[in-house]
Amino acid sequence: MKEKMNKIPVFYACDDNFVKYTMVSLQSMMDHASKEVQYEIHVLHTNISEEMQKKMYAMENANFSVQFDHVTEYLHSVQEKLPLRDYYSKTTYFRLFIAEMFPEIDKAIYIDSDTVVLGDIAQLYAYDLGDAYVGACKEQVMIQEEVYGTYVEKVLGVERDNYFNAGMLVINCEQFRKNHVLEQFMELLPMYNFVVTQDEDYLNLICHNKVCWLPQKWNVEVFGQIPCREEEICVLHYIMVSKPWHYSDCRLQEYFWESAEKTSVYAEIRQVLESYTDEERKRDAVSCDRLMQMAKDEIAKENNYLNLVKAGKLKSKDRQITTIVNITEISIKIVCKASVHTMVLIPPLKV
């Protein structure tokens, strides 16, 4: 690895509406960081205002630097292909560009903005990933919610306890580049439109069997049963609609507000909570129901992703696709004009 332990690159991705929550996450990270380490904070964006950038720059200190990185050039090639849904925005795809945008970086942390960091992120960065593409934690929604667990097994072909949440990743940028992860994503994108967890599904397919599983304390989702003791939590993740700035009874919201109070956007965030209407909360409930129905519909589809691959019916007008079946995996060999590589799209299947 090129980076030294005393200089850690950390990436967020957000827009102008969400950057205030990024600031809360960053504040919590700073509160628990080592004074012996330098942290380089990158914010990937397309439209954050100068006013909000100034507020975040003001958070810099002797150990933390902040820079805003515009991703328009990298987003342009996929903009028309990105399927959007409800609370998803194009920012969710930005993490895929990190390795290519920053060729000098061999390892980086990506973290969602709807998080609170309660441990030293340097300890997370210190994990040896080996040749894994990412270090990640298991997605608890897939493990604890039957519909979503069935979805990943019947639509993606990934066992529910081998599916990771992409809201906190230690990215092995060197392996991303070496194994053309961004290129694989771009090849998968037009082949099948994943509508449930979108880029998280693509990442789980591409990175299957190339994951360094990290202790669950590094991505504790506010959902169902918490997989560790509260005092052990290092990263708290307010997933889906469970946002403390929308719900005063959000579980574990006290950690968010403790950090929010220290930021220059505290009053603004409190106003968001106070002005969030019952109608908006109803829409949240509808959104959750709709997402679950999408998962059920995908499971029931005859031409869902897994069924198409099994039948050898995935097609792309720009490339020749051949299915290769053996007892351990189904692979798709993609023969392009410029290169030939094999992309493992379906993991080992139980029969």
Question: What is the meaning of each model-derived region?
Answer:
Residues 115-148:
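Conserved donor-nucleotide/metal-binding helix-loop-beta segment in metal-dependent transferases, i.e.
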Residues 28-37:
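Short, acidic, metal-binding catalytic loop of nucleotide-sugar glycosyltransferases
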Residues 111:
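Catalytic metal- and UDP-sugar-binding loop of GT-A-like glycosyltransferases, i.e.
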